[in-house]
Amino acid sequence: MFQNDVKQPLSWEEFHGPNLGYVLELYDQYVQDPTSVDEDLRGIFDELGAPPSEMKEEIGKKENSVVTSEQIQKIASVVKLAEDIRTYGHLNASVNPLRKEKELQELFPLKEYGLTEEDVKNIPISIISPDAPKHISNGIEAINHLRNTYKRTISFEFDHVHDFEERNWLSKSIESGELFKKKPADKLVSVFKRLTEVEQFEQFLHKTFVGQKRFSIEGLDALVPVLDEIISESVTQGTSNINIGMAHRGRLNVLAHVLGKPYEIIFSEFQHAPNKELVPSEGSIGISYGWTGDVKYHLGADRQIKDEDTKSARVTLANNPSHLEFIDPIIEGSTRAAQELRTQKGYPAQDVEKALAILIHGDAAFPGEGIVAETLNLSQLVGYQVGGTIHIIANNMIGFTTESNESRSTKYASDLAKGFEIPIVHVNADDPEACLAAVQLAVEYRKRFKKDFLIDLIGYRRYGHNEMDEPSTTQPMLYDAVRKHKTVKNIFADKLVSEGLLTKEQREEIEQAVATRIEEAYQKVPSKKEHTIQEIELPEPVSNGFPAVDTSVEFDVLRKLNEELISWPDDFQVFGKLKRILEKRAKVFTDDRKVEWSLGEALAFASILKDGTPIRMTGQDSERGTFAQRNLVLHDSQTGNEFIALHELSDANASFTVHNSPLSEGSVIGFEYGYNVYSPETLVIWEAQFGDFANAAQVYFDQFISAGRAKWGQKSGLVMLLPHGYEGQGPEHSSGRTERFLQSAAENNWTVANLTSAAQYFHILRRQAKMLLREEIRPLVIMTPKSLLRNPNSLSEVQELTDGQFQPVLEQPGLVHDHEKVSRLVLSSGKVSIDISDRFTQMEEPKDWLHIARVEQLYPFPAKDIKAILSKLTNLEEIVWTQEEPQNMGAWGYIEPYLREIAPEKVKVRYIGRRRRSSTAEGDPTVHKKEQERIVSDSLTRKN
C-alpha cells in the first residue's frame, strides 16, 4: 500500500499569517545554526529550502504580521505537544487487554502546555501533522487526530529510529489514516473463522487430553491470523520462502493452522498412537521424524502454499527445543540461504525478496536470553543480513511464574530492539483489526527499507505455564481477571454482529462446522492399544557410515589451481612480507617443495569449487586467519581494495563466501547451521578464533548439531574448525574441549578429528564436500592446529594430495623394525603426536620395542585400522594412550573402553598425560613446558 503512496513535498505557501512570521524567524535561526532548532524543524527546513524573496517582503509590509513573543510561544508549545503525543502516546495506549488504560487526555492536557483550544485551532495543520487525512480542517482537529491515532489499541515507538526518511515514512503511514481503513467484511469474517479454529482446537485438546502439556496459545489467539496475514501479504509481493522460528507456546496451533499439519496427526501424538498413515498422500506438508523423536511441541513442518494468483511459496516452521530463543539465528541463516544463488563463481547473488524470516519471541525470553541481542546484531552485517526480519513478541506478560518486573529492567519487553533502531508496534491481541494494521505496517516497512520490524503482540495466558500448572497460587489477582475475561473470538464475534457484518446464525454455523471437523479428525486416530511400541532403528545409511570416496586430485589440476591462487592484478599491491610468503607457494609444484597447512586448505577449497560445490566460511578473523595463515582476502597496501583469488578461478563452478564474523559464537554458529540445513549442497564452515571459545555456543552443539537428526531427521554437514593444542598459552588458548564432542558422539552423529598434516586436512574437507547430498552425511568437527600450521612435520608431499585419501589412523613415518620385538604401541592424536614424532626421530637409543600411530579420526572410532596394526604386533605388552590434555579431558575417557575392547588378551591399556584437573591448562609457560616434556618422555621411555 504505502510504497506507492508518495509524500507531497512541503511548500512555503502552506504558511500564512502570524505563523508565517514565526516560521521565517525560526528559519533565520536555522540558517545561522541548524542545531538551534528542533530536529523535526530541521528536517522541514531541509526540505523547504529558502523562502521566496517576495514572501519576506510581503510579511514586512503587513502590520498584522508582527508576531508577539506570546504567539511564538503558543506555536512552539503546539509543536512540542504534537511531538510528545508521537513520542509518548504509547504510554497511555489501550494495548493491555486485561487493564483499562487512563485516557490520553489526562497525559497531554492543553493547559499543561499553556494552550487553549482556540490557540491550537489557529495553528496550521501542516505544522502539527502534515500527513493528516483531508477531512482534518484545523489545528485542534489535527491534535485530536494525533491523540486518537497514538492512543488506540495499537501504539507506536520509532523515536529511536534516526534515519529521517524512515521516520518520515513511518509518521506518514501512521497519521495518514490509511493504516486504519476498515477491512472488507469478507476479510473480517475470515479472521473470525480462523479465531474459531484456534480457540476450539485448544478447547478440544484441553477437555480430551486432560493434564497433558500443550503450551496453549489461548490469550494470544491473534498470533495465528497475524501469521496468516504476514504470509499472505509476502507471497502476494513475490516471496517464495517464509521461515518461521518460535518456541513451544502456541506451536501446536501454528502447526495445525499455519503449517496445515492435520489434526489427526497432532491428536495421535497426544495418544502416542501410530500416525504414519495419517500423513496426507498429496505431500503438501513435510513432517520429518528422527529415530529417537521429540515431544510434539518441539516439532516443525514444511508446507507448500499457493495464493489466489497461483503464486507458490514454501512455509517452514523450524524444529526447536525448549531453549527458547536459540532458534533465532538458525532462521536467519536458513533465510539467507534461501535468498542466495550459488551456481556462479564469486559471492552468491542475493535477492532479499525471495525469502522472509519471521521470529516469534517470548516476552520473558526476548530481553532475558542473550542470543536475541547477538542475533539482532547480525541484522545489518553484510555477511548475515536478510533484508529485514519481522519479529513478533508473543507477549502474555508473564514468564512461567515470573512477572515482568522480576524478569526485565525495562518498561517493555521489546525495549532491547531500540538499540538496533528497529521500529516497534505494541498491539492489543484482543483487537484483530489492530493486529492486521500492525502487520500491514511491518510488511511494507520491511519491503521498503530492507530492515527489521517488531510487533509486540500483547495478550495474556489463559492457563498456567503448562496445563498441569495452577497459576493462581502465584498470581491470584491476575488469574481472577483472566477467568472473567472473554476470549478474543467472542469479543470479535460480538463486534462483527453489532456492526452487521455477521449474523448470529452465521456465527453458530461457523462454530459448529469447526467443531464437527475437529471431532471427525479425532475419530480417525487409531487407538493406542492397537499397536506395540518399538524402538526405531537407525536408518541404514547412518548406521553404515561413510563409504570410501576418492578425494585425490590430478597433479596438473592442482598445479593450475595453485597458479591462479597466487595470482592477482598487475596493479594490485600485496603487502610485501605476505607477497613473499605467497610467492613461495609457486615453487611447491616446480621445486619439489612440500604443501603447508593453509595451502592444503586453499587447494581443497579451489578443487571443491571446481567440482561445483559452493563454499561458505565465516568466523572471527577468518578472512586472514587467527594465526595469519590463511589470507584468502588480500588487501592492496596502497588503496585498501580487496582481492579474492578464489573468486577468479577460471574453472570454478560455484560461489565462494568468506566473512569475518562479529565477536559472537552462538549466533554465528546458529546462523551457519541454519544456512547448511536449508542449503545442504553447500560446504558451510564455521571457525572459532580459538577452540576454547566454542563453548559459548554449547547449546547448538548439544541441542541441534549433535542430536538434530536423531530427534527430527534434520541432516547437517556443517564443518566446525576449532584451533586446539597445548603450547603454553594458558587455559583460554589451549583446548577446544574435545571431550565434550566425544561425550555426545554416538549413532554416527558427527565426525570428530584431530589432524596432523596438510594432506589429511585436504582430504577430509574434500570427503565432506563429496558426502553433502548423500544420506550418510554428518557434521564434521576438526581440532585444527596452531603451532603445527608452520611445523615442518605437518607438511605434506604433493603426491599425498594427488594419490592419497583421508586416513583415520597414520603410522609414525620412519618406523623400521621387526614387529615381533615391539612391546609398546603408543597412540595419540593431534599436536602431541608431532611432539612425540620430533623426539622419536632424535632418539639415539634402540627404538625397536616401540610402535607409534596417530589417531586422526577419533569418532567414529577407527577400530578396523587399529586392529590392523595390532595384528602385526604379536608380542605386544601394552597400549599407551598419550594426550596433552588432563586425564578427565581430551579423548582418554572416550577412547579407553574402545581400546580395552580391541586390545589382545593380556595386553594392558595405559594412560600417559596430565593428571586430572579442573582447569584445562597451566597458566605458566615454564610449568607447561616441563609437563609437556615429561609426557613425551614417558611415552618413549621403556619401563624397567
From Swiss-Prot:
Residues 925-936 have a biased composition (Basic and acidic residues). Its EC number is 1.2.4.2. Signal peptide: none annotated. The keyword Oxidoreductase applies. Its cofactor is thiamine diphosphate. One of its GO terms (cellular component) is cytosol. The keyword Magnesium does not apply. Residues 918-944 are annotated as: Disordered. Belongs to the alpha-ketoglutarate dehydrogenase family. NCBIfam families: 2oxo_dh_E1, PRK09404.1, PRK12270.1. E1 component of the 2-oxoglutarate dehydrogenase (OGDH) complex which catalyzes the decarboxylation of 2-oxoglutarate, the first step in the conversion of 2-oxoglutarate to succinyl-CoA and CO(2). Homodimer. Part of the 2-oxoglutarate dehydrogenase (OGDH) complex composed of E1 (2-oxoglutarate dehydrogenase), E2 (dihydrolipoamide succinyltransferase) and E3 (dihydrolipoamide dehydrogenase); the complex contains multiple copies of the three enzymatic components (E1, E2 and E3). This is 2-oxoglutarate dehydrogenase E1 component. It comes from Bacillus pumilus (strain SAFR-032). The gene is odhA.
